[in-house]
Regions:
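Residues forming the flavin
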Residues: 1-203
Length: 203
């Protein structure tokens, strides 16, 4: 049995108008980018046009971010959200990717008092924390009202943040306006993987 992978990143929220040309014909666009600096794979996942950012809890009470959308048009919002995840494959001697992912999520919980963090992309790029006043100035209105304004650079490793920023800059060519100061980033989003059975030609 083996499993040495974990995907860690953020949930991105932007106005529908930025993603409509992708989500209307495709609903969920699957975008992949290999980051310039660290060459990590960065992918989009779970795209929700007109959706809501949500909070869910893992074992041990760890709060992480997720998202969903409703089939009922009357329940849809003016925003689209999706995960942007950095794929991480660890090598020996480390072999506890689930523990690592939980640890990163717990850092976010520590800084928010147990909830999900939100930051404007513009504040992240300027190296400053998003606070209540800066969030109030955002033209993108957060759909997760309980999210706590903060600074994701205190939570996500430099490798992950750099890869996410580089991918967002690249994806902006496909969806102009994505790489905007008012784009909202929620953290942490973590995807774990089950152990795989190692087989050979005899089994």
């Amino acid at each position: 049995m083996s499993n040495n992978e974990v995907d860690i990143g953020v949930r991105v929220e932007v106005p529908n108008s930025i993603m409509d040309h992708l989500t209307k014909p495709l609903y969920e666009a699957k975008l992949v980018y290999y980051a310039d600096t660290f060459e990590n794979k960065v992918r989009t996942f779970c795209m929700n046009p007109g959706g809501l950012v949500s909070e869910e809890h893992y074992e041990g009470g760890i709060a992480v971010v997720n998202g969903h959308s409703y089939n009922d048009a009357s329940l849809r919002t003016e925003n689209t959200n999706f995960a942007m995840l950095v794929s991480t494959h660890f090598t020996k001697p480390f072999g506890e990717p689930i523990r690592y992912g939980n640890y990163i999520a717990q850092l976010g919980n520590m800084l928010t008092g147990g909830g999900v963090m939100v930051q404007r992309l513009g504040d992240l790029l300027l190296g400053r924390r998003t606070d209540e006043s800066r969030l109030a100035k955002s033209t993108t209105r957060p759909t997760l009202k309980t999210a706590v304004p903060g600074d994701l650079s205190f939570v996500l490793p430099h490798r992950h943040l750099t890869s996410i920023i580089e991918a967002m800059r690249a994806f902006d060519k496909l969806a102009p306006g994505l790489y905007s100061r008012n784009t909202l980033l929620y953290g942490v989003e973590v995807k774990f993987y089950s152990s795989k059975v190692n087989v050979n030609n005899r089994f």
